[in-house]
Amino acid sequence: MNQYETVFILTPVLSDVQMKEAVEKFKGILTAEGAEIINEENWGLKKLAYPIQKKSTGFYQLIEFKAEPQVIEKLEINFRRDERVIRFLTFKMDKYAAEYAAKRRNVKSTKKED
């Protein structure tokens, strides 16, 4: 199994319930295909660097997971078909990126405890 990280941007016109529903849909696709979700972060509403589909903001979401390579194709097909997703990027993490992500998670968890 390889470790992947995917960041996707949801359209800003969604309510909180609709946004969570979309995220749960993609997490469900991953778990149904046998992926192990390691981390999930909601980065919130952010300004885009340039307009995408006439929108200047979007809800950013990050999901870090371990999966087989064929799962990525199914996930990205669902990203393309879903009108709520305006942009996405999935990449395979090498061992250094995975170590860095683990350190970052540990730092965030210690900050939350303080």
Swiss-Prot record:
Region forming the signal peptide: none
Query: What InterPro entries does UniProt report for this protein, alphabetically?
Result: Ribosomal_bS6 (IPR000529), Ribosomal_bS6_sf (IPR035980), Ribosomal_S6_plastid/chlpt (IPR020814), Transl_elong_EF1B/ribsomal_bS6 (IPR014717)
What is the protein name for this chain? Answer: Small ribosomal subunit protein bS6
Superkingdom of the source species: Bacteria
Q: Which family does it belong to?
A: Belongs to the bacterial ribosomal protein bS6 family.
Task: Give the lineage.
Answer: Bacteria, Pseudomonadati, Bacteroidota, Bacteroidia, Bacteroidales
UniProt entry tagged with the keyword ATP-binding: no
Q: Name one GO biological process term.
A: translation
Any one GO CC term of this protein is: cytoplasm
So what does this one do?
Binds together with bS18 to 16S ribosomal RNA.
Q: Does the keyword Transferase apply?
A: no
Q: Which gene codes for it?
A: rpsF
A molecular-function term among this protein's GO annotations: structural constituent of ribosome
What's one Pfam family here? Answer: Ribosomal_S6
Give the species this sequence originates from. Phocaeicola vulgatus (strain ATCC 8482 / DSM 1447 / JCM 5826 / CCUG 4940 / NBRC 14291 / NCTC 11154) (Bacteroides vulgatus)
| Annotated keywords | Ribonucleoprotein, Ribosomal protein, RNA-binding, rRNA-binding
